[in-house]
């Protein structure tokens, strides 16, 4: 398994409950693919450097997880079709993930 980070930019028009629902759904997608969630950070509402989908603010959420390479394609497919996600990026953080105690 490799260690990844995904950064999501969510629409500022979403209610708090809707944002939490999107985050929980995406965590579920990752867990069904056999990933290990390391952290989920809510960065909150931030001003954007340039408009994205005609919006100047967005809510940032960061996922850090260890996953097999095959899980990333499914995760990104689901993120692309999820309403409320304006932008996202997934990057590989390290060559190999070693669980604690291994």
Swiss-Prot record:
One of its GO terms (biological process) is translation. SUPFAM superfamilies: Ribosomal protein S6 (SSF54995). It comes from the Bacteria. It holds the Pfam family Ribosomal_S6. GO terms for molecular function: small ribosomal subunit rRNA binding; structural constituent of ribosome. Keywords: Ribonucleoprotein, Ribosomal protein, RNA-binding, rRNA-binding. CDD domains: bS6 (cd00473). GO terms for cellular component: cytoplasm; ribonucleoprotein complex; ribosome. Binds together with bS18 to 16S ribosomal RNA. PANTHER family: MITOCHONDRIAL 28S RIBOSOMAL PROTEIN S6 (PTHR21011), SMALL RIBOSOMAL SUBUNIT PROTEIN BS6M (PTHR21011:SF1). Belongs to the bacterial ribosomal protein bS6 family. This is Small ribosomal subunit protein bS6. The gene is rpsF.
